[in-house]
């Protein structure tokens, strides 16, 4: 069992051992939440692994939400477990699981996180599931030495009961609950350890490291023979002449066969996770994809997406490659992925979102995919067969008559795409010739040493080989044959071969191929050298003489290149290509400006590049499958002719240059800073204003990240603004700019207003930066002035409150004593003039008291400190009470008060006391400034739009617009009122204080209503108060 910590050391920790004994799923994570330090069997099963070794010291890809929840707990620095509800599962199914997370200390004192949850199966067998192999043995032992549960091969160790009892006693005496020593098993001793997990009841974990004795393994695997074994063997023994062949077959059968991938067409859709870096290189992919398409097909980590797409033949329009450059979220992209060992492709749907670091540096994409095996379709390129590394066992060649051998020509080159250097033929296809086979155990069938005994047998074998090659060629090709482009390319190669006379050269080679027209009798040849030696010329003769570059490879491993490729690239040998970097160094899929090319470019040894056309085919190679990549240099004639542009004369050229210079001069003259940014977020150039604004020289800032121009607190906002414009979202349409803080080269800070726009052709950006220092200074001055005004208002309110308190007490005494003296309770005054003086004192005192109260109320309203109790108020009732109070005064002034209330008027939400005060103030003003015989009309209404309206109309003297504005100001009285006072010769004590209308308006607005006044001189005044629908309690 691998890992930085012994398995039993962590299993014996106080925070782990009891849960381990119960069979809980347990997982110990490092604080990066990715590295698995320890896990038990149920824990590995919980996260989709069958064995503990598959997960320990590995990387666990937890969902983002789960990471966030666990990370939040880990920062609390407490050992108490915390419950976290997360969704776990693979594919399209996930289940809500309640995990318990706690901080623990490992044996060496390092802090870690323990993630645990209870499992439905809490048996002893479940507790040690996923543990033990041929060299590691696990068991749970109770207090008396009885084995409760054990790994499959534990019984073969033959540990005695007395040995187990001694181990239990030693574990009980150990202070750390662990004993490590050599343990007697049968006739020898092996290293082991035992840990005491629980005390009541006692349960121990026993770990043994070492192989079981050989005699037990043999006995366990032996099968008893029947009594008549010798007779049976004599009946089934072959003839002596077939013994060598059967011995070879037996040797081949005894070789261990690797486990092959089997595609399940009826499997449900599977979901997998993938990651790519900023350069498009796959950095991670979950095993769910390999479970469907095969491990070789899913082995793309470390490869760029463009290379995988070129090899697998998807994303031919470059749409996904373009999305990887956009750095924006995308989804719903569908491609066809080859299935290992089959002629099928399965649809895969991909989605991804960009990943950034804390410094807003682009880290690549993280996404998921859904692969649907039930919707698999035929792959005309049969790429999956090349990925399998050999011919599938279920492939059977068709039975067709042998055809007459042909000279090397067009058909030979076409056959080359499927059968190059293939000498691994199933024995069932060829008839059994007389062979002299030298047995060599441990070697492949294709490496057996074969000598032909006579020319007749050689001709027979050659004919059958030709038949097999033809049948195999038809079996490995798709039913539709080669595509039109591939067939034309190979025909061109064949034509060149004819012109150069390569057909005669190939016909006269030392080892003729199986498709020659006739085979000359030859003498028996000595055994051929084994495959461990260099490849023989007969396997690569045709490839070596081809005039076009050819590469035979499997993934990143290059098996063979011909001389034409070495000549065109400038490398001396295949080893030089491998040491330089292999396939990746030969091809360049990106142009100098970072954009992905649509065509393939071959890179030479000196760094120069050349465009080529590539044709990829799956072929048989050294008993397995590989890919043959044939390249055809693209000549100038093959390139599309550029569109003919009208030739510009010197005058047009000069005019264009002058126009460009004018634009540059305009940009440099502008007071705003202009910065050009490339798609990577780096500065391309800036104008003079931007250079002066930040204090950078132009060449000093070019190539640096755009974020360097901003303070730390504004860098994220600026880069978010930039990335938001790179897509086609809301920001690209509603571009309203940002306020940011710029950073000068010397460290100073500047308030800026930034607007960024997209450049149409280069996919870059243009940022316009304006210095708003003066704006900020003005804004600060306004803010300070507002604060000063608020402070003054608060001082006034505080002053009025104090004055009110100081005046109210003596004023109440004056009013009270005047009333007491006027009543003559302690004797007659004796003079009527004194009685008039007392009434004047009383009236004046009440007037001053009302003035103080009004001043205090209006100051409280302005400061927002007036206590108001909002409740349901019947407006009709409140106005009715005010009319009843004002009726005596109206009678004395000979003014008629009329009312018109709407029935079923809904209640309003308001302060009852202030509403009555508003009605009294309005009625008092209306009666006071209406001549005898005039009318005051009070009405209420419920409008169609939901408003409740109160109107007070009089037939008084009226006011002009300027007089209305003056009347609404505190302590202001209009001239018309002064004239009326002089005309009527009323006592000044009956006049107002100038606070009536301002106080009324303030109270109305404090009740969330609207106050309006309309008046004309000589025509009267109308005051309207509107309560909006939000303040109306309608049914």
UniProtKB/Swiss-Prot annotation:
It is found in: Cytoplasm. The modification Phosphohistidine is found at residue 805. Its main location: cytoplasm. Residues 659-730 form the PAS domain. CDD domains: HisKA, PAS. Residues 1-613 are annotated as: Important for polar localization. It comes from the Bacteria. Keywords: ATP-binding, Cell cycle, Cell division, Cytoplasm, Kinase, Nucleotide-binding, Phosphoprotein, Transferase. Its EC number is 2.7.13.3. Residues 500-533 are annotated as: Disordered. Residues 802-1031 form the Histidine kinase domain. InterPro entries: HATPase_C_sf, His_kinase_dom, HisK_dim/P_dom, HisK_dim/P_sf, PAS, PAS-like_dom_sf, PAS_fold, PdhS_histid_kinase. It holds the Pfam family HisKA. GO terms for molecular function: ATP binding; histidine phosphotransfer kinase activity; phosphorelay sensor kinase activity. Residues 614-1035 are annotated as: Interaction with DivK. It catalyses: ATP + protein L-histidine = ADP + protein N-phospho-L-histidine. GO terms for biological process: cell division; regulation of DNA-templated transcription. GO terms for cellular component: cytoplasm; plasma membrane. Functions as a polar differentiation marker. Essential protein that, by localizing in the old pole of dividing cells, controls cell division and maturation, probably through control of DivK phosphorylation status and cellular distribution, which in turn regulates CtrA, a transcriptional regulator of the minB operon. The asymmetrical localization of this protein is probably required for cells to enter a new division cycle. Interacts with DivK. This is Cell-division control histidine kinase PdhS.
